[in-house]
């Protein structure tokens, strides 16, 4: 017979049989070799077919191995191994059966049919282990499903649904799906579409994370529980794995064959199977090559006729981008819009999921944590959607507590490290024999004994707490498994067994859980001394703070005191601007105490004043105060935005322009660091159109970038600086602050539009600096020089006369404090640099600076 008439799987099995014969030094390929090779190939399906026919497959494999060991061996046989006469006869019989059935190719199961009638060793073993001809023939008919084998890969296309889909209803039966809370309207609308005569294919469209896949899981749970109309009862809901369909399709037409096999299996089911395709937009263009059809086009006829009950899910953007472009595909689906749930609905969803997450992590999730997760995620995580972002917070906070439970508590870890340190020291001191060393050794021994006792006490408490926690955890898991069993019994209608579990075993387990939890409470004088086992609102706030950089968690006492004394801290670097410092400090205190308007930035200020009086310095100081670093200061020099088109640099270029994908400078910075100080320096130099962009930022705390994404500015402090009104401030230096402010505001109104000024929280006028202020600034500047000298192991002492001389040299009422820096460089740093290079000051020396004859003198 011709071997090219065998199917691909049969040819592979024959090749494997040849390898078996070679490995065993057998001169011929016997029927036993071929049958064992078929059983060893898990993908061939022969093992499953024989199991269906009632054959004990493991015992058969063991018998075949023994039979092969008894076959004659030929050492050093270098010739080609050929098919034995017995196997050739069996293959010819299989060929005859194939002709009778009208098959173009000989499939593996026909060899089994021939073998079941054979009287040789392999046939005898098959019968011995339960394989009679009638049962094997019945199993073959069931697997073939009345179809002919007309392609070499026909065996690979069998049971396509099993290979390329996952049964969601089966997972629901096993209790592996999360409970679906709410979403009744969307599920009802999907059922309504599924019951139509034609085009009965709903597609769920919504933003990422709103719960589209959860709706399908909810439908699977309702089908399992029988909470659906009669026409949907007992149906299967399968998830199509498109990646598995495409994976390994090497030749043209292979992907199409697989998809056709899936569609054929579905059509055989007479509408008893619903298919769910997640990310349905991937169908468009899937498997398309030159001249080939893509998956979307192959599905269209079945979708239109109503043969294929398909549920799709995709996001709004991808639906518009892929599905809407293909009008023929779009009309075959009915849209079901899935909106973002409200905060209240999200809280209900989280309460439903609470038990699953508690069992998974082995921690308790409190109700305040659930409320905090919904509210904080809605307020601070603006670029994602509920309920996904709230679930993420709960999951991460619980994961953090679980990680702490699995590792050694911090208090014990510190003691452990200290003990190791002392033991090393003891070994070193032990080698010394003098009296001082012996005294030190005695002290070390005493400390080690004391710390060891403390460590042992803590370890005992830790073990007790951990044991209590693990005990209650195992009971919770048992209760969860029991509830799944009860649901299954309820579906089967086994009321007697259900009553036994519900009124017998379940109350016992709940009583044990209550006992374990109450015992834990009594046994601990200080509850949770070492282990945190609860996720509270504070833990959720910590996760939000870590993810966004926004301080959401409760203020510690130290931070409260720091905020109350904020003016003093700012005055350490900003001299003589009391009104400005107070305005900024009040804005920060409002935000941290929770009184600030949540829909606006923390504060928006316009700083007006002459050059060099501390406008920019105050912003830098504020950033350092809030974040302990200047990195969170987003500084934009508005002199770079003098042209009309430069607005695009702030928010990103519009579609069609170069740089569209890159995003805007301001919007990208704020997206990465939502909690920051934004400094718009020299704001009057920008083009008037730039201010139009800032209007919505100042009013609503939001800005839409070039790509249509909304960027949240609600956690920023916006400061604009300008030199407008400098001349009036200089001229009216001695007048009252309010009089100066009115005069400056008159000039501001000529420069900026009323709607822009009206949106700014406070316009702050900075005073010009007098000689006393300059002297204070000189001290601050010299402090910086002292720090630089300290790195060189030098110290600096400057007399009051020398300081006055420097201040006088650096005082210029027009230019503010900037000339002072230049004066310090020229009068102090330059001569000092020469002296250091000349070797005048060795390490640990003190540089004395005094005033002599109107000049600075070094000693």
Swiss-Prot record:
Region (Linker), start-end ranges: 341-549
Major location category of this protein: cytoplasm
Domain of life where this protein originates: Bacteria
Residues annotated as domain Clp R: 3-146
Stretches for region NBD2: 559-768
GO molecular function per UniProt: ATP binding; ATP hydrolysis activity
The keyword Glycoprotein appears for this protein: no
Chain spans, region NBD1: 159-340
Chain sites annotated for binding ATP 2: 609-616
Segments for region (Repeat 2): 83-146
Keyword Repeat in annotation: yes
Keyword vocabulary terms for this entry: ATP-binding, Chaperone, Coiled coil, Cytoplasm, Nucleotide-binding, Repeat, Stress response
Pfam families: AAA (PF00004), AAA_2 (PF07724), AAA_lid_9 (PF17871), Clp_N (PF02861), ClpB_D2-small (PF10431)
Region (Repeat 1): 6-71
Stretches assigned to coiled coil: 391-525
Binding-site residues, ATP 1: 206-213
UniProt-annotated location(s): Cytoplasm
C-terminal: annotated segments: 769-859
Similarity remark: Belongs to the ClpA/ClpB family.
Free-text note on domains in this protein's UniProt record: The Clp repeat (R) domain probably functions as a substrate-discriminating domain, recruiting aggregated proteins to the ClpB hexamer and/or stabilizing bound proteins. The NBD2 domain is responsible for oligomerization, whereas the NBD1 domain stabilizes the hexamer probably in an ATP-dependent manner. The movement of the coiled-coil domain is essential for ClpB ability to rescue proteins from an aggregated state, probably by pulling apart large aggregated proteins, which are bound between the coiled-coils motifs of adjacent ClpB subunits in the functional hexamer.
Subunit structure and binding partners: Homohexamer. The oligomerization is ATP-dependent.
Protein name in UniProt: Chaperone protein ClpB
Species per Swiss-Prot/TrEMBL record: Chromobacterium violaceum (strain ATCC 12472 / DSM 30191 / JCM 1249 / CCUG 213 / NBRC 12614 / NCIMB 9131 / NCTC 9757 / MK)
């Amino acid at each position: 017979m011709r071997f090219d008439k065998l199917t691909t799987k049969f040819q592979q099995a024959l090749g494997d049989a040849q390898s078996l014969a070679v490995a065993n030094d057998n001169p011929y390929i016997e029927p036993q070799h071929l049958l064992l090779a078929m059983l060893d190939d898990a993908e061939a399906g022969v093992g499953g077919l024989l199991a269906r026919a009632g054959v004990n497959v493991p015992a058969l494999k063991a018998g075949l191995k023994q039979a092969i060991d008894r076959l004659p061996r030929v050492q050093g046989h270098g010739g080609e191994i050929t098919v034995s006469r017995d196997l050739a006869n069996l293959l010819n019989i299989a060929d005859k059966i194939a002709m009778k059935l009208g098959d173009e190719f000989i499939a593996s199961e026909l060899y089994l049919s021939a073998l079941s009638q054979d009287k040789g060793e392999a046939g005898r073993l098959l019968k011995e282990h339960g394989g009679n001809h009638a049962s094997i023939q019945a199993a073959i008919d069931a697997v073939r499903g009345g179809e002919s084998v007309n392609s070499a890969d026909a065996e690979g296309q069998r049971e396509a649904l099993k290979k390329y889909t996952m049964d969601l209803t089966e997972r629901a039966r096993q209790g592996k799906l999360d409970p679906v809370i709410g979403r009744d309207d969307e599920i009802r609308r999907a059922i309504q579409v599924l019951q139509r005569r034609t085009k009965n294919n709903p597609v769920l469209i919504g933003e990422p994370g709103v719960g589209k896949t959860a709706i399908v899981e909810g439908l699977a749970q309702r089908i399992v529980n029988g909470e659906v109309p009669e026409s949907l009862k007992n149906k299967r809901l399968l998830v199509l794995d498109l990646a598995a369909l495409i994976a390994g399709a090497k030749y043209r037409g292979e992907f199409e064959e697989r998809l056709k096999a899936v569609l054929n299996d579905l059509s055989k089911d007479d509408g008893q199977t619903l298919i769910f395709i997640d990310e349905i937009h991937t169908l468009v263009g899937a498997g398309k090559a030159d001249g080939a059809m893509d998956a979307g086009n192959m599905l269209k006829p079945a979708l239109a006729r109503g043969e294929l009950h398909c549920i799709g899910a995709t996001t709004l953007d991808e639906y518009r981008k892929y599905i809407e472009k293909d009008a023929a595909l779009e009309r075959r689906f009915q849209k079901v819009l899935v909106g973002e749930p409200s905060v209240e609905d999200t809280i209900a969803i989280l309460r439903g999921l609470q038990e699953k997450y508690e069992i998974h992590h082995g921690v308790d999730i409190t109700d305040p944590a659930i409320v905090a997760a919904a509210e904080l995620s809605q307020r601070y995580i603006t670029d994602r959607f509920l309920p996904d972002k709230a679930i993420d917070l709960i999951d991460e906070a619980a994961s953090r507590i679980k990680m702490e439970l699995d590792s050694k508590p911090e208090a014990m870890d510190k003691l452990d490290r200290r003990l190791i340190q002392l033991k090393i020291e003891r070994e070193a001191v032990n080698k010394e024999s003098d009296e001082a060393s012996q005294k030190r050794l005695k002290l070390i021994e005493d400390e080690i004994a004391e710390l060891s006792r403390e460590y042992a006490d803590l370890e005992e408490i830790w073990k007790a707490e951990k044991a209590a926690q693990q005990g209650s955890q195992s009971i919770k898991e048992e209760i969860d498994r029991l509830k799944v069993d009860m649901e299954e019994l309820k579906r089967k209608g086994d009321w007697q067994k259900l009553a036994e579990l519900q009124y017998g075993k379940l109350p016992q387990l709940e009583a044990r859980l209550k006992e374990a939890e109450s015992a834990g409470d009594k046994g601990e004088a200080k509850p949770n001394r070492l282990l945190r086992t609860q996720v509270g609102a504070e833990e959720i706030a910590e996760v939000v703070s870590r993810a966004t950089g926004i301080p959401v968690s409760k203020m510690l006492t130290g931070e409260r005191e720091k905020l109350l004394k904020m003016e003093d801290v700012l005055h350490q670097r900003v001299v003589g601007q009391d009104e400005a410092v107070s305005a900024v400090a009040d804005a920060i205190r409002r935000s941290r105490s929770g009184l600030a308007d949540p829909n606006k930035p923390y504060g928006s200020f316009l700083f007006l004043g002459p050059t060099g009086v501390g406008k920019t310095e105050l912003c830098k100081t504020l950033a350092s105060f809030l974040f302990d670093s200047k990195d969170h200061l987003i500084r934009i020099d508005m002199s770079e935005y003098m042209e009309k088109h430069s607005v695009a640099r702030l928010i990103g270029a519009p579609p069609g322009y170069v740089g569209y994908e890159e995003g805007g400078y301001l919007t990208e910075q704020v997206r990465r660091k939502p909690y920051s100080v934004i400094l718009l320096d020299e704001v009057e130099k920008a083009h008037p159109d730039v201010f139009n962009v800032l209007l919505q930022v100042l009013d609503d705390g939001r800005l839409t970038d070039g790509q249509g994404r909304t960027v949240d500015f609600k956690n920023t402090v916006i400061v604009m600086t300008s030199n407008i009104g400098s001349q009036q401030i200089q001229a009216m230096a001695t007048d009252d602050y309010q009089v100066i402010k009115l005069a400056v505001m008159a000039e501001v109104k000529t420069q900026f539009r009323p709607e822009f000024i009206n949106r700014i929280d406070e316009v702050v006028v900075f005073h010009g600096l007098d000689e006393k202020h300059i002297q204070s600034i000189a001290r601050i500047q010299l402090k910086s020089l002292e720090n630089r000298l300290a790195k060189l192991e030098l110290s600096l002492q400057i007399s009051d006369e020398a300081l006055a001389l420097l201040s006088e040299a650096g005082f210029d009422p027009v230019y503010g404090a900037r000339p002072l820096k230049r004066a310090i460089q020229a009068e102090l740093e330059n001569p000092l640099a020469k002296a250091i290079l000349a070797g005048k000051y060795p390490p640990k020396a003190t540089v004395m600076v005094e005033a002599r004859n109107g000049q600075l003198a070094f000693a």
